[in-house]
Regions:
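C-terminal engagement/docking regions of AAA+ P-loop ATPases
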Residues: 2-21, 28, 256-336
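Conserved C-terminal "switch" segment of AAA+ ATPases
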Residues: 16-24, 37, 177, 191-262, ...
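Pre-Walker A (pre-P-loop) alpha-helix and adjacent loop at the N terminus of AAA/AAA+ ATPase modules
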Residues: 19-63
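Conserved alpha-helical scaffold flanking the Walker A/P-loop in AAA+ ATPase domains
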Residues: 47-50, 104-126
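Walker A/P-loop
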Residues: 49-90, 103
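Canonical AAA+ ATPase core
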Residues: 104-109, 133-137, 145-236, 283-285
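Walker B catalytic acidic pair
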Residues: 128-129, 140
Length: 336
């Protein structure tokens, strides 16, 4: 009897391992599919995928023309998600994003309201230049991101699952923009810098995008596959050394005694949501690389994109030329 139960336990463990390996293979295939179209942005692709695998949203910061829109479109294809895009402008209203109710009349003369869903009812939404919309419109989207549903005319409408937002900002043009408040920035799991491609990547871009046949991504996953991967991420074991590294890093990024001499440079720092985000992100990165447990290296790699939009420097620190990436680098050096 004992041996029979032992065999069934081994079979169950084998099934779990096989399912995990299959999920990891799907995730790696999706990354390869995206990278076959988006050249020279490997770190951006990785961090965008880590965000989605963690069940979160990302803020992409970069100048125009760096394939941010193409990244979202390609991710939608590779992950098998329904992707939509909204161009944010100062005159954009909350109803333009969430949807609205219209009065309809039947042939019999009966009138009733019908809800017309807005573009937020997508599995992957690109909020292009989110800081160009009014604070009221920004809040409507960010509330939907947090609550996973919208309320119009007193009626609740659940958003599809999975639901992820990749918002973009242009770091150069500040005229006519409405910067996101700190509390709303905290809704984004990561802030990802999109930089210029290197020489070889740009050469490849020239040949691939100006010829007769442009490379197109192929679907590597479905929405159900992604949901399974997100569940697996939450079940991956995390070693005590990784937990301690996360706690030490996040707590030292706040003004106070735990920051030591760096504390006087910090005006305000990340809350517990940053620790939660980092805990999920390191698991997702491990899965993306075919590992079933994260390491301290994952913490160090993802510290900056998870923390930098969740903290601010004092006026004196900024006057001395200090930057948030510089401060995070010093905090990482204490751990690594």
């Amino acid at each position: 009897m004992a041996s029979a139960s032992g065999e069934s336990l081994e079979k169950l463990e084998d099934m779990i391992v096989r399912a995990a390996e299959s999920t990891a293979a799907h995730v790696r295939a999706a990354k390869a599919a995206i990278s076959s179209v988006i050249f020279g942005q490997d770190i951006v692709v990785e961090r965008a995928l880590v965000t989605v695998l963690s069940g979160g949203h990302a803020l992409l910061v970069g100048v125009p023309g760096l394939a941010k829109t193409k990244l979202v479109e390609t991710m939608g294809i590779a992950l098998g998600l329904d992707a939509k895009r909204v161009q944010f402008t100062p005159d954009l209203m909350p109803s333009d994003i969430l949807g609205t109710e219209v009065l309809e009349e039947t042939p019999g003369g009966k009138r009733s309201f019908r809800f017309i869903a807005g573009p937020v009812f997508a599995q992957l939404l690109m909020a292009d230049e989110i800081n160009r919309a009014s604070p009221r419109t920004q809040s409507a989207l960010l509330q939907a991101m947090q609550e996973q549903h919208v309320t119009v005319a007193g009626a609740r409408h659940d958003l599809p699952k999975p639901f992820h937002v990749l918002a973009t900002q242009n770091p150069l043009e500040q005229e006519g923009t409405y910067p996101l408040p700190e509390a709303q920035l905290d809704r984004f799991l990561m802030e990802v810098d999109v930089d210029y491609p290197d020489l070889e990547a740009e050469r490849k871009i020239l040949f691939d995008t100006t010829g007769a046949d442009e490379t197109r991504a192929k679907a590597a996953m479905t929405a159900d596959d992604l949901i399974a991967a997100q569940r697996l991420v939450r079940r991956l074991p995390v070693g005590e050394s990784v937990v301690e590294a996360i706690l030490a890093l996040v707590r030292s990024a706040r003004p106070g005694p735990e920051a030591g001499d760096i504390g006087k440079l910090i005006s305000w720092g990340p809350g517990p949501r940053a620790s939660q985000a980092l805990m999920l992100a390191v698991r997702a990165r491990a899965l993306l690389e075919g590992r079933f447990a994260p390491s301290v290296d994952d913490v160090l790699e993802l510290a900056e994109p998870v923390l930098k939009h969740r903290m601010a420097l004092t006026f004196a620190a900024r006057a001395e030329g200090k930057t948030i990436p510089n401060v995070i680098g010093r905090l990482k050096a204490r751990i690594g």
